Amino acid sequence: MPKVALYDMSGAQVGEIELNDSVFGIKPNQAVMFDFVKMQLANKRAGTASSKTRAEVRGGGKKPWRQKGTGRARVGSSRNPVWTKGGVAFGPRPRDFSYRLPRKVRRLAMKSALSSKVLDNNIVVLDSLTFDEPKTRLMVQTLKSLPVGKKTLVVTAYGDPNVIKSARNIPGVKPLRADFINVYDLLNYDTLLITREAVARIEEVFA
């Protein structure tokens, strides 16, 4: 089972914590993580892009000139796609881009992302993370005392409101509750800063 250092809020190492091998110790599957991120980004798409066809563009009801006898090319509407101010041929229409990967694939992707953080030594586990009141300054001090990167994902077990409010205004820092942890954020942020309680919650769900 992988072991990582356990820190307190002052940045002092207070011991070690054993992580569940089936969640934090598997060989990361790059292809599955790619598929999951692709699904996440597709599901975020609004799908509202829309262009007008020749039938929907205003005007163009009258035939510009008669069919024969002018020497010009035959044309039925001044709003055909070839003309200026014409409609769009095969343009985007509103659609739903969302889809869902199988449950086992989603779980494997999450375990792979968590394991990659452990392998790359980009996980910092805190004994606890609590504030009496929301103060950005206190969160900044805590982050400065810990070995974290410029972009840090702060994960707590149940989304402590004081922690969320203290962290959400810091550039490059994203607070998250354990139930909302996802592959895209794990890969997008340099360091995973997670509480011991959140680790237990994740292991409870994915082990």
Swiss-Prot record:
Keywords: Ribonucleoprotein, Ribosomal protein, RNA-binding, rRNA-binding. It holds the Pfam family Ribosomal_L4. InterPro entries: Ribosomal_uL4, Ribosomal_uL4-like, Ribosomal_uL4_dom_sf. GO terms for molecular function: rRNA binding; structural constituent of ribosome. One of its GO terms (biological process) is translation. Residues 60-71 have a biased composition (Basic residues). One of its GO terms (cellular component) is ribonucleoprotein complex. The keyword Magnesium does not apply. The keyword Transferase does not apply. Residues 47-78 are annotated as: Disordered. It comes from the Bacteria. Belongs to the universal ribosomal protein uL4 family. One of the primary rRNA binding proteins, this protein initially binds near the 5'-end of the 23S rRNA. It is important during the early stages of 50S assembly. It makes multiple contacts with different domains of the 23S rRNA in the assembled 50S subunit and ribosome. Forms part of the polypeptide exit tunnel. Part of the 50S ribosomal subunit. PANTHER family: 50S RIBOSOMAL PROTEIN L4, LARGE RIBOSOMAL SUBUNIT PROTEIN UL4M. This is Large ribosomal subunit protein uL4. The lineage of its organism: Bacteria, Bacillati, Bacillota, Clostridia, Eubacteriales.
